[in-house]
């Protein structure tokens, strides 16, 4: 799955590739954030966080400046699309910056595989992550894209399965399910995108009319800068029952990310752009 993929890539970069510094952001998925913190605590790596603006946009000039400030071997870990506010990162530009500064680049592409056209022959990320359930494949299965020249090694040993990157008997039915779901989604990508983008545009229009002072978080209203599957809003009132009330009307919303379900603390992503 995406979580295991992100863990493996980041930990192996530190343990096997000699990475001494990780540049990331407070917008990352919890599995990336906590893995980076663990590597700082256990391995003593330097951890640098880019500060997003109030729209959740990262300053790539600042990234370049930080990369040029040290000769430490560096991994940049920045997600392609944020799972809470939907902001898209220009991973082609980040790849270019990383290559120019001899840094490794990992992108959590869990939200965008099968939803956007990705070509890793052209977009020169070193590592990327995918999870099948994001395109209606089976839960608990995903993949890690690893550039052959990277030298990355697996963390689970004892067998040569999965190109020596993950020992153990393969989850064949999960892998086949992932492949079939990916095939179906990519074949119908344009149709699916147009349909869901239409629903998102309608929701933005109707919410704006119905709720004065509603706030759309990140770049939610800009289809060029936001993933079509995600719409994040801040309401100008408090209603702890709103999730239940909308569910009774047949409308599903999320009041937090799945990785933080049940948590009483506010979203780290929203805190980083709203405070």
Map each language-model feature to its residues.
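Pyridoxal 5′-phosphate
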Residues: 1-275
């Amino acid at each position: 799955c995406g979580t295991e993929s992100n863990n493996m890539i980041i930990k192996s970069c530190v343990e096997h590739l000699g990475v001494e510094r990780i540049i990331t952001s407070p917008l990352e998925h919890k599995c990336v954030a906590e893995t980076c913190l663990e590597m700082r605590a256990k391995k003593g790596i330097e951890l640098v966080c880019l500060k997003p603006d109030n729209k959740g946009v990262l300053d790539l000039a600042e990234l370049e400046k930080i990369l040029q400030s040290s000769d430490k071997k560096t991994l940049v870990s920045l997600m392609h699309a944020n799972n809470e506010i939907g902001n898209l990162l220009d991973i082609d530009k980040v790849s270019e910056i990383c290559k120019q500064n001899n840094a490794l680049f990992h992108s959590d592409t869990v939200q965008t595989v099968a939803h956007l056209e990705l070509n890793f022959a052209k977009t020169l990320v070193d590592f990327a992550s995918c999870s099948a359930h994001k395109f209606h494949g089976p839960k608990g299965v995903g993949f890690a894209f690893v550039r052959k020249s990277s030298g990355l090694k697996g963390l689970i040993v004892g067998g040569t399965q999965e190109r020596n990157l993950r020992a153990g008997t393969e989850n064949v039915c999960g892998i086949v399910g992932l492949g079939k779901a990916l095939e179906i989604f990519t074949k119908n990508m344009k149709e699916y995108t147009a349909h869901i983008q239409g629903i998102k545009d309608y929701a933005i229009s109707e919410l704006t009319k119905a709720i004065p002072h509603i706030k759309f978080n990140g770049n939610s209203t800009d289809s060029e800068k936001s993933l079509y599957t995600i719409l994040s809003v801040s309401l100008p009132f408090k209603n702890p029952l709103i999730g239940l009330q909308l569910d009774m009307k047949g409308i599903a919303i999320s009041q937090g990310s799945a990785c933080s379900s049940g948590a009483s603390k506010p979203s780290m992503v929203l805190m980083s752009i709203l405070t």
